[in-house]
Structures are given as structure tokens and as C-alpha cells.
Amino acid sequence: MELASGTTLVAPQPKGILDPATGKPIGSNDAFFGEINNELADKGFLVTSTDELITWARTGSLMWMTFGLACCAVEMMQMSMPRYDAERFGFAPRASPRQSDVMIVAGTLTNKMAPALRKVYDQMPEPRYVISMGSCANGGGYYHYSYSVVRGCDRVVPVDIYVPGCPPTAEALLYGVLLLQKKIRRTGTIER
């Protein structure tokens, strides 16, 4: 990099995490960053921000756990089998909530099961995500008017992705996983 005598490059102060217009980190297209990136790209280096690096790693290594309550769990099992192979997207199953980033709630959530769902959700490390799968988990489904059914798991835990259907297909659930990865890329993982 050639600089005129007496001039120095100073990185601008960060103004926030994401630019609302472009969805990219603010400051990634400034002159200082551009010159360093051009200089190092010729030498085989990649210049990025820490937030982008962590977000990239997190989207490619989502560990999920099941909270299968009814027939939607069969489609969830089908998604993890070799035909759809969700692990090629970095979406691997785990048995413990302490090792999981994503919880898939599939099926009818009853009032008696709601505290257990919240307890398992609280045991998951931050950042944690929830996919609500099927009509019963989304809003009570066929049993919506029953006295013992919670009308949607979003009344107990915050839901990030809703997958509609009764039961939704394995392709729909896989599409929901891809939407979750897209959401993580868009929002970042350091501050949520």
C-alpha cells in the first residue's frame, strides 16, 4: 500500500452491527477495509470480521434436539435419514439440550408437558433457536379447542421458524432448517 507522505489510514468507528438497507455489517465497504482487503487478497488471505466468521461457523454447525410429541416426529425422523441427509447442511442431532443449538417442537403440546418444554429450553446454551413443526405445535392444530392443549408452543418458548402442515413433509422441515440458517446469517450471533 502506498500512502502519501504524512497521511495515515485510520479505521472508522463502528456504527452498529448491520446496515438495514443492505443487511451487511456496517464498515465492511469503507475505504480502509477495501484497501486492506485488496492488498491481502492478492497474497491469498481472506479478510473478514469476527462476527461474520462466528456466524458462518454457527450456520454450518447447528446441533438439534427433538421434542417429538406426536405424529410430526415421524417426518422429523425421516428428515434425518440418508434420503434427505440433513447433516450435509451442518444440521446434526444431539441427545442432550446442553449440546444443542436448535430445538424442534413437533406435535401437540399439552398443558402438562409445557413446563417440561420450558425446562428443556432453559437448559440449552445461548444462542438457542426453536423450530415449531406442524399445525399442532404452531397453533394447537386439530386439538385446538381441547381444555388440555396449549394453543401453540410460542406461548411457552420463543419460536424462530414455523413449519406449517399436518404433518409437514420432510422437505418442508428441511426448508425450515435452511430458513433458520438464513436468519442466523442475516441477524448474526454475537448480539441477538
Curated annotation (Swiss-Prot):
Pfam families: Oxidored_q6 (PF01058)
Cofactor binding mode and count: Binds 1 [4Fe-4S] cluster.
NCBIfam families: nuoB_fam, PRK06411.1
SUPFAM superfamilies tied to this protein: HydA/Nqo6-like
Cited function: NDH-1 shuttles electrons from NADH, via FMN and iron-sulfur (Fe-S) centers, to quinones in the respiratory chain. The immediate electron acceptor for the enzyme in this species is believed to be ubiquinone. Couples the redox reaction to proton translocation (for every two electrons transferred, four hydrogen ions are translocated across the cytoplasmic membrane), and thus conserves the redox energy in a proton gradient.
GO cellular component, one term: respiratory chain complex I
UniProt-recorded name of the protein: NADH-quinone oxidoreductase subunit B
Cofactor: [4Fe-4S] cluster
Name of the encoding gene: nuoB
Compartment(s) of residence: Cell inner membrane
Subunit composition and interactions: NDH-1 is composed of 14 different subunits. Subunits NuoB, C, D, E, F, and G constitute the peripheral sector of the complex.
Membrane-topology descriptor: Peripheral membrane protein
Lineage of the species this protein comes from: Bacteria, Pseudomonadati, Pseudomonadota, Alphaproteobacteria, Hyphomicrobiales
Enzyme nomenclature, EC number: 7.1.1.-
Family that this chain belongs to: Belongs to the complex I 20 kDa subunit family.
Record-listed [4Fe-4S] cluster binding positions: C71, C72, C136, C166
GO molecular function, one term: quinone binding
